[in-house]
Amino acid sequence: MKRILINDETCMACHSCEIACCVAHSKSGTLYGALAEAPQLASRLHVEQGGKGRGFPLGCRHCQDPHCVRACVSKALYVNPKGVVLVDEKRCIGCLMCFIACPFGSIEKGSKAQEVYRISKCDLCAELDEDPACVTACPTKSLSFEDPDDFSRNKRVKYLIELANAPEAVA
């Protein structure tokens, strides 16, 4: 299954991914429309600031055996056939058990609807027929949408090419 993978060496914490996420999940699909919506949209991905001015975008990891799905008492959280963890907002009762169960803190307390908090989490832009909006918006290509095995292989190949092109050490 493809996942959003992060190159923390190139992320400059510009938050373009967060903005793209809000716009992609807005009713209007535009930045100005998203800003005007009430309740205000929250990104389903968050850039956490690290040391030395570096950022690290964090979102749902779409685990193979998700704790959040097991903790959901109303069965609002489920895994679709592609392996994406999704939420059926109509079934969500706002108990926040999934929020507590997620080991990555990737589930957010969303908007309050009818006195019940709904949750908000990354859905890999499942309704789009393309890469997730955050990946497309990243100006440094720090986010990629690919199979983790391919990502790992490509990283090894890149390292080997760099190693092969490095000047020999002088003793």
Language-model-derived ranges and their functions:
Residues 1-9:
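N-terminal beta-strand motif that seeds the catalytic metal site of vicinal oxygen chelate
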Residues 11-14, 92:
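Short, thiol/selenol-centered motifs that function as redox-active sites or metal-ligating centers
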Residues 14-35:
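Core segments of cupin and vicinal oxygen chelate
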Residues 28-70, 90-91, 96-171:
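Flanking helices and flexible, charged tails adjoining ferredoxin-like Fe-S electron-transfer domains
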Residues 77-78, 115:
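Beta-strand-rich solenoid/repeat architectures in extracellular/passenger domains
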Residues 78-86, 94:
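Mid-length scaffold segments of soluble, non-membrane domains
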